[in-house]
Amino acid sequence: MNRNTPLTAHPLHGVRHRVWSAQQLRAEGVSAAQAASQCLPGGPWQQLLPGVFLLHPGPPTDQERVHGALLYAGRPPASARRAGPAPAGPEYGEAMVTGLAALALYGFEAAPPVVALHRVDVLVPRTRRLRSTRFVQVVRAAVPPRPQTRLGMPLAPVERALADAVASLTDAPTVRRLLTEAVRAGYCEPAAVVRELSAAKLLGRAHVVDAVEELLAEGRAVAEDRLYEMVRRHGLPEPLWNVDLCLPGGACLGAVDAYWPEQALAVEIGAPAPREGGTADREHLERLGVTVVRVTPGRLREAMAQQAVVVRTAMAAAEDREPAAYVVVLPR
């Protein structure tokens, strides 16, 4: 092989086969010296990253940059590379794309396209001895999350990718747009985003706190829209929306998102864990004969039909109960 001879021993198909690691080339019979000779000025290849080669002379596409970043970050440790040929298994190891690059690959409109990013963030286990280089920014995790796959590439879950993106952003409008889109487009739930931002110690930043307030408001609005959709799509009777339930003397027992007076049935949108003070209100209402069904935003998004069955079943059960105590229903 001379320096102008491209790799043609095996058919090359798709973006993956235009970006190869040194270990993959070695498994195909291409030595380190031969690979280096292909990258001399005027040669057909170029070294994209340490140990990663681009098998054409032009600029890399956005997918080639991401694939190269994953090959660099996912390569085995040096000791394993010296031990022998590439082992069978995932070519990226435990590496996954995170940050703005991951959000762009998920399809976020608020994230710049990968080609416009000056770096690609790649998440790896904390134990990996790996340095950031060129356009690759190494991000570490004590316990890496389970990746999602898009375009054949492992991506950090949206909430983790958001936290890693926000960590490097100081532009408040961009942070707000990213967080809002995550919820509005149904990528993840607000609680999951807040958990990741808290774990990354980002909730002390003023512009992040402001964005989280908008995120929670957006999440609430989206969940309410889904509750309206559930009632109408599944033919449930129209309830009273967004009301306070009070005793005749004026003491308020709690706010609910939907209430069917004839069945004394209330539906409340809530987080998986009841909010502070919510349990006491619910218990008081149930002692008065009011059934309270709690639905989470996630269940409304992922299992709307099942939640409709729960509500319909509660309505049917109301026919066998003693009449509820009189409560006053007030607009919230």
Please provide the spans of the model-predicted regions.
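Short gly/ser-rich loop at a beta-strand->alpha-helix junction or flexible surface loop bordering the NTP-binding
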Residues: 1-204, 240, 316-332
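Surface segments flanking catalytic/ligand-binding clefts of nucleic-acid enzymes
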Residues: 2-4, 30, 183-332
